[in-house]
C-alpha cells in the first residue's frame, strides 16, 4: 500500500503542478500537508463535509486549483480510470491477498452481509482500481467507502459509525476484518469487534490469524465474535 500511496501522490502532485503552472516541489509539499490533515482528521467535529469536499476545498485554498472545474475534474477522473490501472508495476506489486476470495465465500455461505471499509483517503476511481488489482472488482460488497461517501478517515470511530448507519447496522452486530493494527480498530472504541489478519498481536483483536486461517476457520471466528458479544452485553 505504501508504494501505491507514493506513486499516486507523485502523479497527482505533478498533474496539479502542471495544471496550475506551479513548481512541482512546492505543489508536492502543499498536497502532502493536505493529505496528512485529511488522514489525521484535523477539522472541527461539526465539519460534516465529505473527505472529497474537504480535499477539494483545501487544494483550492492552498494550491489555487479548483478541482471541481469540469475540465480539471475530467483530467483526474481520466487518470484514475485510464492511467492508474497500468501503474501496478514491480514496485507496487498489488495482488489478491491469499485467502481473500475464500474468506468472502465463507461470509456469503453464512448468509452474512459484507462491505469494504477501506480507508477513504482516495477518490472512488482509485479505490476501484485497487480493487481490480486485488481481483475484487466483482466482489459482492454492499458498500465500498471512498472519499466521496465518508466524512472522516480511519481509525476515527465516526468513519465507522456513519457507514454502519447507511447500512442500518449497530456496532455490536459488526465484525471488522483488517490487517492494519491501528486503522482497523475504531478510536475511540465504539463497540465494533475486529478480526485481525495482519502482523503482530493487537490486544483488542477478537480473533487473530491470516486471511487463509479466517476462511478455513470461519466457524471459530464466528464463535469468538459471539462470545465477545455476549461478554460485552453482560459487562
Where in the sequence are the language-model features?
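A metal-dependent, Asp-based hydrolase signature
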Residues: 22-84
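Short acidic alpha-helix initiation/capping motifs at coil-to-helix transition points
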Residues: 3-13, 48-58, 121-122
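Soluble or luminal CAZymes and related metallo-dependent hydrolases
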Residues: 4, 8, 51, 92-99, ...
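Conserved aromatic-histidine-acidic binding/catalytic patches
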Residues: 1-4, 43-47, 92-95, 115, ...
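Active-site neighborhood of HAD-like aspartate-dependent phosphohydrolases
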Residues: 1-30
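Substrate-recognition element of Asp-dependent hydrolases with the DxDx(T/V) motif
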Residues: 80-96, 100-132
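Asp-based, Mg2+/Mn2+-dependent phosphohydrolase catalytic module
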Residues: 101, 105, 119-122, 127-235
Amino acid at each position: 500500500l505504501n508504494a501505491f500511496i507514493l506513486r499516486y501522490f507523485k502523479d497527482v502532485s505533478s498533474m496539479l503542478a502542471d495544471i496550475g503552472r506551479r513548481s512541482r516541489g512546492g505543489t508536492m509539499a502543499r498536497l502532502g500537508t493536505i493529505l496528512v490533515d485529511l488522514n489525521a482528521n484535523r477539522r472541527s467535529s461539526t465539519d460534516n463535509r465529505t473527505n472529497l469536499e474537504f480535499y477539494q476545498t483545501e487544494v483550492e485554498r492552498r494550491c489555487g486549483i479548483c478541482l471541481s472545474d469540469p475540465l480539471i475534474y475530467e483530467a483526474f477522473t481520466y487518470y484514475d480510470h485510464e492511467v492508474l490501472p497500468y501503474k501496478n508495476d514491480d514496485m507496487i506489486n498489488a495482488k489478491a491477498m491469499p485467502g481473500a476470495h475464500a474468506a468472502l465465500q465463507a461470509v456469503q455461505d453464512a448468509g452474512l452481509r459484507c462491505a469494504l471499509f477501506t480507508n477513504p483517503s482516495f477518490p472512488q476511481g482509485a479505490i476501484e482500481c485497487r480493487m481490480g488489482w486485488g481481483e475484487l472488482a466483482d466482489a459482492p460488497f454492499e458498500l465500498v467507502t471512498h472519499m466521496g461517501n465518508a466524512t472522516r478517515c480511519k481509525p476515527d470511530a465516526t468513519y465507522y459509525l456513519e457507514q454502519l448507519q447507511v447500512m442500518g447496522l449497530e456496532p455490536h452486530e459488526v465484525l471488522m476484518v483488517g490487517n492494519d493494527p491501528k486503522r482497523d480498530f475504531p478510536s475511540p472504541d465504539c463497540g465494533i469487534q475486529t478480526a485481525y489478519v495482519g502482523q503482530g498481536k493487537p490486544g483488542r483483536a477478537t480473533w487473530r490469524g491470516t486471511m487463509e486461517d479466517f476462511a478455513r476457520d470461519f466457524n471459530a471466528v464466528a464463535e469468538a465474535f459471539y462470545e465477545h458479544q455476549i461478554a460485552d452485553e453482560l459487562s
